[in-house]
């Protein structure tokens, strides 16, 4: 662990041996952030993506420069179908640690597959349109739009959830059940 003031390697002491700064609270922040990251990692490994997302976001609230937590949060967002949020996390990670950062590979992988990136963007636009239809009461149009979204991007958790909600509202209980099972499979 490095001192947040001078960058020197810290010891077990509550003070930096190099600059004399009190690092007791800083060490506690890092420890708490890492504990939340580890919990998020465990949840991600068993595909509890929503739980992992929450723990990783809390880890970053405690210490925003936790690069492994930020990169994993990006992966969780990507797995949940939120490519924009994933890219945002990886870009922030890259800005905090420009060298030796696996976020480079993630960003490159997404950007090199332009066709897939365009498909994700199209799915997001259609999802937003479906959301507008649902809010204005055009539930049949929302269902049509959401089915198009999911044909483009089948791991888009928010689209599955909105389709389930609209299906419940239109008394299509079997469709809602099917969509919720898909969400449970993804997350």
Where are these regions (language model features)?
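Short Cys/His-rich micro-motifs in 6-15 aa windows
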Residues: 20-29
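Conserved structural position within tetratricopeptide repeats
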Residues: 24, 60-61, 92-95, 150-151, ...
């Amino acid at each position: 662990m490095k001192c947040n003031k001078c960058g020197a390697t810290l010891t077990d002491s509550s003070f930096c041996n190099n600059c004399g700064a009190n690092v007791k609270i800083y060490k506690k922040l890092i420890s708490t952030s890492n504990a939340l990251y580890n919990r998020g990692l465990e949840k991600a490994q068993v595909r509890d993506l929503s739980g992992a997302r929450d723990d990783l976001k809390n880890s970053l609230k405690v210490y925003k420069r936790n690069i492994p937590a930020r990169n994993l949060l990006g992966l969780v967002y990507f797995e949940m179908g939120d490519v924009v949020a994933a890219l945002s996390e990886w870009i922030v990670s890259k800005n905090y640690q420009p060298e030796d950062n696996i976020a480079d590979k993630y960003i490159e992988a997404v950007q090199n597959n332009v066709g897939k990136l365009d498909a994700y963007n199209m799915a997001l636009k259609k999802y937003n349109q479906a959301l507008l239809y649902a809010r204005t009461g055009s539930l049949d149009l929302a269902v049509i739009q959401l089915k198009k979204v999911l044909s483009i991007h089948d791991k888009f958790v928010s689209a599955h959830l909105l389709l389930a909600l609209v299906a419940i509202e239109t008394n299509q209980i079997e469709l809602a059940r099917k969509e919720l099972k898909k969400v449970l499979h993804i997350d």
